[in-house]
Every structure is written in structure tokens, then in C-alpha cells.
């Protein structure tokens, strides 16, 4: 909040002070959190084009100036020196992992990459040609029945475990959905492969033609995931925050965000 800076709002001849808030990149906003309490008025802002819903130190993006930073680090630097797994850890914890922390987080991703075997049969219920994003949203929601206790308290106690389950299993779900769409048998995750290599292998390996790992393709996927790791307060993020505010199970919350992401106007 800018020190001693206020905007003056006059309603029916009465003056009200609205604190001026300044972001790290110099953006300015008016704090109207006390508006209704102090004046009895609310604001009308269709589409929330003029509203910042929260304070955040996770991501800064300015498309016009070509700026994207995660936790203050330019995405170009992360793309050059970090992996997607390191970037995910950065977004979760506010700093890049040490060697030991990276090993521990990577191990969690591997240990939680498998789906419950009963979930394989769920894919048989989708019609041929079903939208892959709709399948993904449904299957993520189904995870909430296998992990019913992933709530606010469990997230506070072990954010790494909850995040690892989600980050790892979404990759497995996406690969299974793709294999189902082309009529090929599913490919299970492998602990000896990196995050991106594992995803590619699940997508393109075949019983009749083993997938030959291409390091350039692995690198390209890694860069793609880094660039899309977080994009500030967009529609899907807002959806996740809104649904999650009711203390909904983590997987059901993320499922809602995926549904928002599937929309053509996202």
C-alpha cells in the first residue's frame, strides 16, 4: 500500500478516503474493501475488467511489453536454466529448490504417477470423439473420490504431496485419454524417466513400435510447460480460487478450472 496516498470519493457531499495500493511494477489500484461498510455502496464491474481480486506475489505478466515473471524471475531465465519440475517447485514455494529438495520433489512425482487401476474403466464410458478437455476435467474430478480428504488442512500439512499427486497424475490422465481416443492400449508411467520424457513415452509408446526418445522434443515440451506453468489471474485461475474458497476437495477444484480452460474465450 502506498504510504499516505489516498483517493477521495464524494457521495452525497460526504468525503471518503480510498487507500492507493501500488504493485511491484508500479501499477496502482484503489482499495475499496471497506466501501460497503463505510458507505453502503458497492461497485458494478461486469467482467471484472477493473478489479484485482487478490494480492499475489506468484506471477507478473504484461503481454504488451512481453514480460512474464514467476516469483520475480524472468521466464527467459527459467527456460534457459531450469526444468518444469523446478519451475513448479518455485511457484509452490517461492524459491527454486536445492539439489536435495529437487530430488525429494521428483521422487514424489514418480511415486504418485500411477492412477488407481479402477480408473482405467472410466475411460470406456466416454463416447468416441469426446472433447479431450472434457474427459480430463471429468477424470480429475473422479480423483476426488479416491482422495476424499485432500482439503485445506491437508494442503497446509503437506503441499508437496498434494501438488505432486496432481501434477503427476494429470499427465497420466492426459496420456490415457489420448491413447483411448486413438484406440491404442494405454502405457503406464515409468520411474526411470524424467517428467517430460515420461509424458511423451506414455503418449507415443506402442507395443509394436517402442517410442524412441528425442532429447530435442523433451526439451521443447519442457519449455512449453514452463511457459504455461502460470498465467496470473485469468479465467481458470479465478474459477479455481472461487470454487476452492468453499473448501472443496482439491481435485474437484482443479476440475472446475480445467472446464473453464476448455472454453473458446479463455
PLM features: residue spans?
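Hydrophobic alpha-helical bundle cores within soluble ligand-binding/oligomerization subdomains
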Residues: 2-265
Amino acid at each position: 500500500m502506498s504510504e499516505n496516498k489516498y483517493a477521495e470519493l464524494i457521495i452525497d457531499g460526504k468525503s471518503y478516503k480510498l487507500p492507493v495500493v501500488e504493485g511491484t511494477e508500479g501499477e496502482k489500484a484503489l482499495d475499496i474493501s471497506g466501501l460497503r461498510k463505510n458507505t453502503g455502496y458497492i461497485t458494478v464491474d461486469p467482467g471484472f475488467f477493473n478489479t484485482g481480486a487478490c494480492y499475489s506475489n506468484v506471477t507478473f505478466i504484461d503481454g504488451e511489453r512481453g514480460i512474464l515473471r514467476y516469483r520475480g524471475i524472468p521466464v527467459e531465465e527459467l527456460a534457459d536454466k531450469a526444468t518444469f519440475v523446478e519451475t513448479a517447485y518455485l511457484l509452490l514455494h517461492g524459491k527454486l529448490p536445492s539439489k536435495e529438495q529437487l530430488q525429494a520433489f521428483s521422487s514424489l512425482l514418480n511415486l504418485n504417477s500411477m492412477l488407481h487401476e479402477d480408473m482405467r474403466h472410466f475411460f470406456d464410458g466416454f463416447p468416441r470423439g469426446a472433447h479431450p478437455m472434457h474427459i480430463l476435467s471429468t477424470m480429475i474430478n473422479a480423483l476426488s473420490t479416491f482422495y476424499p480428504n485432500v482439503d485445506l488442512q491437508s494442503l497446509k500439512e503437506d503441499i508437496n504431496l498434494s501438488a505432486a499427486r496432481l501434477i503427476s497424475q494429470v499427465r497420466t490422465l492426459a496420456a490415457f485419454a489420448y491413447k483411448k481416443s486413438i484406440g491404442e492400449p494405454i502405457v503406464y508411467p515409468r520411474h526411470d524417466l524424467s517428467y517430460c520424457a515420461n509424458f511423451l513415452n506414455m503418449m507415443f509408446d506402442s507395443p509394436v513400435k517402442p517410442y524412441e526418445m528425442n532429447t530435442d522434443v523433451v526439451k521443447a515440451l519442457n519449455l512449453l510447460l514452463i511457459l504455461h506453468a502460470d498465467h496470473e489471474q485469468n479465467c481458470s485461475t479465478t474459477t479455481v480460487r472461487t470454487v476452492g474458497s468453499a473448501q472443496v476437495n482439491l481435485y474437484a477444484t482443479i476440475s472446475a478450472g480445467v472446464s473453464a480452460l476448455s472454453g473458446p474465450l479463455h
